[in-house]
Amino acid sequence: MIRTPKHLNKRESVNLGAYYTPCYLVDCAYRLLKKHVSIEDYTLLDTACGNKEFLKLHHPKKIGADIDPNCGALIINALANPKRENYGINQDEPLIIVGNPPYNDRTSFIKQDIKNKDFTFEIDNDLKSRDLGISFLRSFAILKPAFICVLHPLSYLIKEANFKQLKLFKDNYRLLDAFVVSSKSFTKSNEFPIVIALYERGRMDYADIRRFIFPTDCDTTLCLNDFDYIANYVDKYPNAKKVGACVGYFFPMRDINALKRNKTFLNAPRENAVRISQDKLIYYQYIHYFKEIAPKIPYYFGNLDIIIENSAFLEIKDAFLKDKRVRLEYFKKLFQGHPCEFD
């Protein structure tokens, strides 16, 4: 069931990233937190508390704030001059930040028709990002809590470009524990992975994320280092300057979820097309067939690059292109141990 604030219309919900957090996910977040921390010794703060789902537990000191004046909480813009005193918290007070901060990627094609680009509120320059969720993570680092336990898109961590955008946050916090769940708990739009993430003081780099083993709600785990990716073998984005003799054109690729929505081979050249050289054609054919099985693999792969087992693929490449059964066996082995819906 999708739950949004009743006093907000659809456009306002999108612009504010305002989706309530189901109770079972709040409980999951606190279980994750309590595995590592005696929370009774800390003040709990949610700087985008919405309906205050994360603050309904019995706790000695809990503070909620939101930019929405109808939330019944402190009316504070968490992204403008964030500091502890805004919330009545002492500098030496043990602090844990909890919650489900807004997610709103203004560069996304999703819901562009209802996003209001004139919807603005003040954001400090060093917190600005194309995504509100990343801005919130940066703001948390300024408040210097001992722990941070929040929900956010898994793509903030597993996509290297997004990870680099974390800046101050990744330089001062490290991922301690995590649990991956589906966005279907919040929205009917394209499914993508969300992580309930617990951070502690420290620092992390992208190599740490690649090694991290993420438990999922499918009773499986996801580790980026367990797989090889098509970007190691082909260009994913326009490459006219790199390819001379061109044998075809391909739609640009972002991740597996984008591949589900978009075309593969193009009948005619486009300005933003990927140019295909003869020696790379086999890999683009691989991507074309990967698109067929993409809806059948678990949602938590959605923000990853197209996965390949290169040596195994090259051994069977001719049969792979000709025989659907060969392709099916290859993909079954590639995703062995994960709950797929192959025929």
Model-derived features: where do they sit?
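Class I S-adenosyl-L-methionine
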Residues: M1-P82, I316-K317, K324-D343
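Short catalytic/ligand-binding loop motif for oxyanion handling, primarily in non-cytosolic enzymes
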Residues: L55, G72, D105-S108, Y156-E160, ...
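Short amphipathic alpha-helix with an adjacent loop that forms part of the alpha/beta core around
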Residues: I75-L95
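Amphipathic alpha-helical repeat scaffolds
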Residues: N77, I97-N104
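Mobile active-site "lid"/loop adjacent to the S-adenosyl-L-methionine
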Residues: T107-S129
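Conserved Class I SAM-dependent methyltransferase catalytic core
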Residues: D126-S183, A197-L198
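Flexible, glycine-/basic-rich loop-and-beta segments that form/coincide
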Residues: N190-C246
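C-terminal target-recognition/interaction regions appended to catalytic cores
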Residues: A245-D343
